């Protein structure tokens, strides 16, 4: 009697949880999370995993749910799979099946009770602003071009420093959030100018839906003297969400990394990912006339 080839899944004696250090260029994606009619990073990644482990349903979990157009240098993702593929081999195998705009830096084995989102102790985001007079094609996908005035970094730092600690940030939470509360702890803030580029970094235990983009738009208003530092602080402390309307564009935002009690990767995915354009000098001479300084009036 002839035997038919079996389509059953091969035996897997040890279910495994794999963690990935992930980078993606967010311009072509509707965000991390799978959507019915959108091209998401999650959908692309799960499709690639299913090609390698087609015998079980695949579900991925991420440290941060980035929005449309937002980039990631150190996103962390986990999924459960069988033991046919060694943990370290998942990274090269997935890179051979993913679009070039998504790269897996490293893949490691984690305990079954470890979770990419719930085990994280912090996330760190960077927002990049191009504050030069002339637009630059090669900066456009990675930064927000604001050129009306030279940003006042001193005022912006004052506004940022007031946010440190545990607070209710519901003024910086977009409608549609599923969170039960809006309290989170801002652990570190940093603002650096290098030539025409201004970099803002914020590290927190967690972020609300749309928080960074809403915050950055208000911060730029402070830097352009359209909003006082005091009014900025009153808006979020008094939860005046109706006064926070504008959001900064997604393409200037990057998830730098997620942190855990113990470092899980042998090389951090974000370590050698300093954007090349942030290190560049301003336009070569002859320099254009300087931008006008922001006036002291508050609008």
From Swiss-Prot:
Catalytic activity: uridine(38/39/40) in tRNA = pseudouridine(38/39/40) in tRNA
SUPFAM superfamilies: Pseudouridine synthase
CDD domains: PseudoU_synth_EcTruA
Residues noted as binding substrate in the record, renumbered to the chain: 125
Any GO BP annotation: tRNA pseudouridine synthesis
Residues the record marks as active site: 67 (nucleophile)
Top-level class of the enzyme under EC nomenclature: isomerase
GO MF term (any one): RNA binding
Short name of any one Pfam family annotated for the protein: PseudoU_synth_1
Domain of life: Bacteria
Classification via InterPro entries: PsdUridine_synth_cat_dom_sf (IPR020103), PsdUridine_synth_TruA (IPR001406), PsdUridine_synth_TruA_a/b_dom (IPR020097), PsdUridine_synth_TruA_C (IPR020095), TruA/RsuA/RluB/E/F_N (IPR020094)
Keywords: Isomerase, tRNA processing
Assigned EC number: 5.4.99.12
Assembly with partners or alone: Homodimer.
Entry's family note: Belongs to the tRNA pseudouridine synthase TruA family.
Entry function: Formation of pseudouridine at positions 38, 39 and 40 in the anticodon stem and loop of transfer RNAs.
PANTHER family membership: PSEUDOURIDYLATE SYNTHASE, TRNA PSEUDOURIDINE SYNTHASE-LIKE 1
Protein name (database record): tRNA pseudouridine synthase A
Organism field: Parasynechococcus marenigrum (strain WH8102)
Gene (UniProt): truA
